[in-house]
Amino acid sequence: QGRLGVSMELRNMSTVDKTLAERGARYGTFMDNARIAQELKGVACQGGSWDKMKADQKEALEVICQKISRIVTGDPDYADNWHDIQGYAKLVEDRLTLIQPTYVKA
């Protein structure tokens, strides 16, 4: 361990390599994430409503699939992933409440 508890190995890595190592420790391997996220997205696209959805709805669901993948392959207690899922869902909800003025949040 070097100064500030940073391992010598980590200090000698490039910035990109450091970022990838940090992300891998937090989220699991990229290959596992890619496989699970793509499978989840594939399932979502098979739903009968997919072709009726607006771009923001599709994108929100795809990003949520990515966040779910990170949760199940990495640190399930990392609150930021759960927070992000809420955020993307809220963006769609906010748009829908503008065009559905009678909608009352439960």
What are these regions (language model features)?
Residues G2-A106:
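Intrinsically disordered, low-complexity regulatory regions
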